[in-house]
Amino acid sequence: MKRSLLGLALVLGLLAAVPLVAHHSFSAEFDNQKPVVLKGWVTKIDWTNPHVWIYFNVKDPKNGQMTKWGFEMGPPHLLQGSGWTNKSLKVGDEIEVGGFLAKNGSNRMSVNNQVGVKFAATGQPVGRGGAALNNATQ
């Protein structure tokens, strides 16, 4: 009887973890064969779990039109380990972001840990960079 209950608990535990794995699937949403570096101005910061999202306007060099973009990063607690806080960036900051484009063609990207997020004026990285920027496998 104990063995059956243990087996059932194990199966239920594994089934419960399936949505978590699906949620953190970088390859389902982003294309690591499509890197991009964009420069723009921060418009909104969502410092929330499970992932921090930062939105920014990118100016088209050809026609001067602004396009809204967003990029996904790791969860707040991992970003804090890389020197980020919820005040590292503020609305209006000009930044340069390296990442991978969304597979669905939307103006979304996932931060590339090697390129990261920099202040455009100085080239200085925001925080210390590294794997905590996005805990997805890239």
Predicted regions and their residues:
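OB-fold/S1-family single-stranded nucleic acid-binding modules
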Residues: A102-A132
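Conserved hydrophobic positions within beta-strands
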Residues: G40-V42
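Short, structured beta-strand/loop micro-motifs enriched in basic residues and often containing a Trp
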Residues: M73-G81
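Bacterial N-terminal signal peptides
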Residues: G7-P19
